[in-house]
């Protein structure tokens, strides 16, 4: 059960980082 929780936290962290980078890079993409 603990493994499932740690996996969920890991995936959640990766998703947060992905969206943070995505929204940060969006203005540059739009300017192109």
Swiss-Prot record:
GO terms for biological process: photosynthesis. It is a single-pass membrane protein. InterPro entries: PSII_PsbT, PSII_PsbT_sf. Keywords: Chloroplast, Membrane, Photosynthesis, Photosystem II, Plastid, Thylakoid, Transmembrane, Transmembrane helix. GO terms for cellular component: chloroplast thylakoid membrane; photosystem II reaction center. The chain crosses the membrane at residues 3-23. It is found in: Plastid, Chloroplast thylakoid membrane. Its main location: plastid. The keyword Hydrolase does not apply. It comes from the Eukaryota. Found at the monomer-monomer interface of the photosystem II (PS II) dimer, plays a role in assembly and dimerization of PSII. PSII is a light-driven water plastoquinone oxidoreductase, using light energy to abstract electrons from H(2)O, generating a proton gradient subsequently used for ATP formation. HAMAP family: PSII_PsbT. Belongs to the PsbT family. PSII is composed of 1 copy each of membrane proteins PsbA, PsbB, PsbC, PsbD, PsbE, PsbF, PsbH, PsbI, PsbJ, PsbK, PsbL, PsbM, PsbT, PsbX, PsbY, PsbZ, Psb30/Ycf12, at least 3 peripheral proteins of the oxygen-evolving complex and a large number of cofactors. It forms dimeric complexes. This is Photosystem II reaction center protein T. It comes from Phaeodactylum tricornutum (strain CCAP 1055/1). The lineage of its organism: Eukaryota, Sar, Stramenopiles, Ochrophyta, Bacillariophyta.
């Amino acid at each position: 059960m603990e493994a499932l929780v740690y996996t969920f936290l890991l995936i959640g962290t990766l998703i947060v980082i992905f969206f943070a980078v995505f929204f940060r890079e969006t203005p540059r993409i739009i300017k192109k």
